[in-house]
């Protein structure tokens, strides 16, 4: 067991055969996430009593992490597109014993009128090209095409359109991807600011000081594997006006 970068509670575990052989995992004492994914809950900075909607939540790591940061107060509505994905979230809820996360099936591209301005925080960790995790999934680069890139950007914007409607006035929207593609990251940020009543807000008060940089002062963080020793990952923090 080694200390992982940036977060004191993040550990790197090695020299084991399978995650299911670890008692700490089976007992729900640990949850598997890259440090980059852990930074989503850090950037969201939920307060006790917050209502959070996690729109693309499976397998539930970010939802459970956000719930843990609130203790037993507040709640997380963890959604994904299929029953299979909702069941993955439920499996992790059961294993970790969290009591304030509820999993359900909800297509993130389909408007849910019951969620209109309902959330203090919305997490939109959207489907992406995955260019930030090619080191773990090298097959991604053989499947990439310009057409697929355009299609994924359209999907992301459909989800962001719904996410924008679910945040309360003065609430927080976290937009994240596991890619390094500008089309899916910075260009989506510019598109979103142009079309919705939001402003970027710096995540610096909530993330480790080592990660503070010019872009985080503006409101977003791009992690690069060769520099940050994490997955390639993008996080933007928006405040609804």
Give the ranges of each region predicted by the language model.
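S-adenosylmethionine
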Residues: 1-241
